[in-house]
A protein has these predicted regions:
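Compact nucleic-acid interaction/catalytic patches
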Residues: 20-22, 27-62
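C-terminal terminal-subdomain/extension
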Residues: 64-110
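Short, charged beta-turn/beta-strand-edge "cap" motif at the junction between a beta-strand
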Residues: 12-16
Length: 110
């Protein structure tokens, strides 16, 4: 599991307005952490595009293998067990990964 990869994950059980269900997530934690820890830090994706500031909208392409446009929900960042990640479907470009890290830094200042 590497930074920038897109995986299907089981996110249940959840509390409140946390993103739930079997859904796509983007791994954002660094590769060294991913190599040694039993968890990864990730952002859930949604196909309900709201264009919130600080969220990246991904269009389907051959690299990410998405079937429809998806918004990365940076404000729903969470740590999940690697056991929750079930199937890798693709990855982000290097630029998209850099942008997500910048957006994460921005939401930490709000």
């Amino acid at each position: 599991m590497k930074q920038g990869e897109i995986w299907y994950a089981h996110l249940d059980p959840v509390k409140g307005s946390e993103q739930s269900g079997y859904r796509l997530v983007v791994v954002i934690s660094g590769n060294l952490l991913n190599q040694y820890l039993p968890v990864v830090i990730c952002f859930p994706l949604t196909t309900k595009i709201k264009n919130y500031k600080g969220n990246l909208v991904l269009q389907p392409d051959a690299m990410n293998n998405l079937t429809q446009a998806s918004e990365v929900l940076t404000f729903h960042i969470r740590s999940v067990s690697k056991e929750r990640l079930k199937k890798k479907i693709g990855k982000l470009t290097e630029l998209q990964t850099i942008l997500l890290k910048q957006y994460l830094n921005e939401i930490l200042t709000y």
